[in-house]
Amino acid sequence: MKGILDSILRVGRMIFAPTKTVQYPEEKLPLAPRTRGRIVLTRDPDGQERCVACNLCAAACPVDCIDVVKAETPDGRWYPESFRINFARCIFCGYCEEACPTSAIQLTPDVELADYRRGFLQYEKEDLLISGEGKHPGYRYWDVAGKTIAGKAQDPVDPKDLCP
């Protein structure tokens, strides 16, 4: 009898408690700022692509969902002729963002990627490339690439000199 009364009281309290459900498409819950969602390719402040087609993002990807084809400009700079991500396979781990030396590939908090056909989840370079600088405004890879640190020796280091 006591168990039945406890159950009735519990149900009675829950009837008048505020609801915890949200009508999703109309109302959205706030996401954490570090939510890993859709992947984008960013640009330099000059408007050039940051990606140098080094293929480190594809090598770091544990599910092999990134495909990069490298091309070269007449001045010798590498760029991705083709950059494809298969979001049907992507697990949004963020390893590609960590591996990128130019901060070109970044994960955004946009998590709404659902589609009815798997083929529509393969994004090409044109779909991924945004006009902004992403999380690192003002960063230019080519301004810091290959520059020496002031006060450091520029000669090659002999490993024998490092041994005790």
From Swiss-Prot:
Signal peptide: none annotated. Its cofactor is [4Fe-4S] cluster. Its main location: membrane. This is NADH-quinone oxidoreductase subunit I 2. It catalyses: a quinone + NADH + 5 H(+)(in) = a quinol + NAD(+) + 4 H(+)(out). NDH-1 is composed of 14 different subunits. Subunits NuoA, H, J, K, L, M, N constitute the membrane sector of the complex. GO terms for molecular function: 4 iron, 4 sulfur cluster binding; iron ion binding; NADH:ubiquinone reductase (non-electrogenic) activity; quinone binding. It comes from Cereibacter sphaeroides (strain ATCC 17029 / ATH 2.4.9). [4Fe-4S] cluster 2 binds at C61, C90, C93, C96. GO terms for cellular component: plasma membrane. It is a peripheral membrane protein. Binds 2 [4Fe-4S] clusters per subunit. Residues 39-71, 81-110 form the 4Fe-4S ferredoxin-type domain. NCBIfam families: NuoI, PRK05888.1-1. GO terms for biological process: aerobic respiration. It comes from the Bacteria. It is found in: Cell inner membrane. The keyword Metal-binding applies. Keywords: 4Fe-4S, Cell inner membrane, Cell membrane, Iron, Iron-sulfur, Membrane, Metal-binding, NAD, Quinone, Repeat, Translocase, Ubiquinone. Its EC number is 7.1.1.-. PROSITE patterns: 4FE4S_FER_1 (PS00198), 4FE4S_FER_2 (PS51379). The keyword Metal-binding applies. The lineage of its organism: Bacteria, Pseudomonadati, Pseudomonadota, Alphaproteobacteria, Rhodobacterales. InterPro entries: 4Fe4S_Fe-S-bd, 4Fe4S_Fe_S_CS, NADH_quinone_OxRdtase_chainI. NDH-1 shuttles electrons from NADH, via FMN and iron-sulfur (Fe-S) centers, to quinones in the respiratory chain. The immediate electron acceptor for the enzyme in this species is believed to be ubiquinone. Couples the redox reaction to proton translocation (for every two electrons transferred, four hydrogen ions are translocated across the cytoplasmic membrane), and thus conserves the redox energy in a proton gradient.
